[in-house]
Amino acid sequence: MTNPVSTIDMTVTQITRVAKDINSYELRPEPGVILPEFTAGAHIGVSLPNGIQRSYSLVNPQGERDRYVITVNLDRNSRGGSRYLHEQLRVGQRLSIVPPANNFALVETAPHSVLFAGGIGITPIWSMIQRLRELGSTWELHYACRGKDFVAYRQELEQAAAEAGARFHLHLDEEADGKFLDLAGPVAQAGQDSIFYCCGPEAMLQAYKAATADLPSERVRFEHFGAALTGEPADDVFTVVLARRSGQEFTVEPGMTILETLLQNGISRNYSCTQGVCGTCETKVLEGEPDHRDWVLSDEKKASNSTMLICCSLSKSPRLVLDI
């Protein structure tokens, strides 16, 4: 991670097992430092001691300014992010983070919120539920997990639902005879002013999009985690022109991203997830047509071709001019 976005030095003060293969990590700043505000659904960028940068959702109540808490699932196919956190990170270690950003914000004025979560996708959803509880708003949760051992925050969720009189449907794959969580039913049954949220794996997101396809886009919100890059691998070479650097040009070779190309050539950029799910590397496009492969930008933004995420998106035109 590099400037101009400032980083904050944090210390790991507590590690808690939340469920099987799922830990929460409490991070606190230097004494006397007040952390930037955040809202439910926000994430922070974390720079790990092994050089890897990742984005993780915040799960603590949004009013807290003395700590950030993230919850991380151990991905057996991890390239070093979750595996490092689970196997090597210890209380007392220091990390640097990028302040919170939110691409999955809660609509606090909604008359009713319908929340869907799959696996570790519960993390931003749990943050939202805590905020909805503070507001006294109505909500319902539909949460799918592999099995009972993998349910994060089960006791807290059950208590929150009981206090709010909210519907809490827990779907366990191991007990469902191969059936997937029903998303279409809750969507159809919800009131016409309800706002819908979903965070989960790709299969769940596709089912969610199908279930909400006829709804106005402002009522449908979602966030991916661990997303695979979309689209076919690019075989074409293209040129990136940096408008703010006297038209400096770089060739992006097949198998490379714009971000990787810039970093290899000493051009520092802010980034975190490298998977197109956090939005940290969003960059303004001045000329050319991006090949959008992220999960953050809205369909309207993608159609405008005015901005792109350079960690994953490529180019449909032979030349891209970026506001860098």
Curated annotation (Swiss-Prot):
Lineage: Bacteria, Pseudomonadati, Pseudomonadota, Alphaproteobacteria, Sphingomonadales
Disruption of the gene: reported phenotype: Cells lacking this gene show a significant sensitivity to pentachlorophenol (PCP) and 2,4,6-trichlorophenol (TriCP).
UniProt activity-regulation remark: In vitro, activated by tetrachlorohydroquinone (TCHQ) at low concentrations and inhibited at high concentrations (above 200 uM). However, PcpD would only be stimulated by tetrachlorohydroquinone (TCHQ) under in vivo conditions due to the toxicity of tetrachlorohydroquinone (TCHQ). Competitively inhibited by pentachlorophenol (PCP) in a concentration-dependent manner.
Cystine bridges: none
Chemical reaction(s) catalysed: 2,3,5,6-tetrachlorohydroquinone + NAD(+) + H(+) = 2,3,5,6-tetrachloro-1,4-benzoquinone + NADH
Keywords: 2Fe-2S, Aromatic hydrocarbons catabolism, Electron transport, Flavoprotein, FMN, Iron, Iron-sulfur, Metal-binding, NAD, Oxidoreductase, Transport
Source organism: Sphingobium chlorophenolicum
Class in the EC hierarchy, top level: oxidoreductase
Pathway it works in: Xenobiotic degradation; pentachlorophenol degradation
Essential cofactor(s): FMN; [2Fe-2S] cluster
Pfam family, one: Fer2
Family per similarity comment: Belongs to the PDR/VanB family.
Biological role: Involved in the degradation of the xenobiocide pentachlorophenol (PCP). Catalyzes the reduction of tetrachlorobenzoquinone (TCBQ) to yield tetrachlorohydroquinone (TCHQ). Also able to reduce 2,6-dichloroindophenol (DCIP).
Cofactor details (free text): Binds 1 [2Fe-2S] cluster.
pH dependence: Optimum pH is 7. It maintains more than 70% of its optimal activity even at pH 5.0. PcpD loses its activity quickly in basic solutions, retaining less than 20% of its optimal activity at pH 8.0.
Gene label: pcpD
Name this protein carries in UniProt: Tetrachlorobenzoquinone reductase
Example of a GO MF term: oxidoreductase activity
Binding positions ([2Fe-2S] cluster): C273, C278, C281, C311
